[in-house]
Regions:
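A structural boundary/capping signal
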Residues: 2-4, 23-195
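N-terminal secretory signal peptides and thylakoid transit peptides that target proteins
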Residues: 2-18
Length: 195
């Protein structure tokens, strides 16, 4: 667990840079990639990627609350699979294309995919944070995406464990540890605060 924790911390320090670079091309999938996915992974995987692109096209100009609901619902249809079972590794952070192509991923994969999709739709980076939390009922590490209407507001939590988007103040099952986005990394100020 100590090694996995160190790896996660290391990844989280690099992620803001990766997220900033990745958001630009998050939904621009080449015809070559789409052909490869169709040939190697089949029609269902190809269709999931097309649906992702369609979601972006349809929701890019929608109000933010609708974008949040559509993106959360879209990715929550993907099957939860642990990294060990899915990738044969203790901790693997999949790209949205990998998540959708294989139709499986864990909480980090869901959070990253939601973040990148919302950024590609124009949601400002300063309104989004990926939050590393402790899921108290499961007694394990977990990751969610938060949307802040304003910097000091109670964020809305997009989570693959539940389909409803709720304010952090109503998520007593989550204890935040740290959060990050393309701009930086923040440590939780006081233990016991909700995401």
């Amino acid at each position: 667990m100590e090694a996995a924790s160190r790896l996660t911390r290391r990844q989280s320090l690099l992620l803001p840079l990766i997220l900033t670079v990745s958001v630009v091309s998050a939904l621009e999938l080449s015809s070559r990639l789409m052909t490869y996915v169709l040939e190697e992974f089949g029609e269902a995987a190809h269709q999931r990627l097309e649906n992702w692109q369609r979601l972006h096209a349809l929701a890019a100009n929608a109000p933010t609350d609708r974008q949040l609901r559509l993106v959360n619902s879209f990715f929550n249809r993907v099957t939860f699979v642990s990294d060990i079972r899915h990738w044969g590794q203790e901790d693997y952070w999949a790209t949205p294309v990998e998540l959708l192509t294989t139709n499986g991923g864990d909480c980090e994969d869901f959070s990253i995919a939601k973040y990148l999709t919302l950024r590609a739709m124009g949601v400002p980076d300063d309104q989004l944070r990926i939050i590393y939390v402790k899921a108290l009922e499961l007694n394990q590490a977990h990751m969610v995406l938060a949307w802040y209407e304003t910097p000091g507001s109670d964020p809305l939590i997009l989570d693959n464990l539940i389909n409803d988007i709720k304010p952090a103040s109503q998520r007593n099952d989550l204890e935040p540890v740290y959060s990050f986005n393309g701009e930086g990394l923040w440590l939780n100020r006081t233990s016991g605060d909700n995401a």
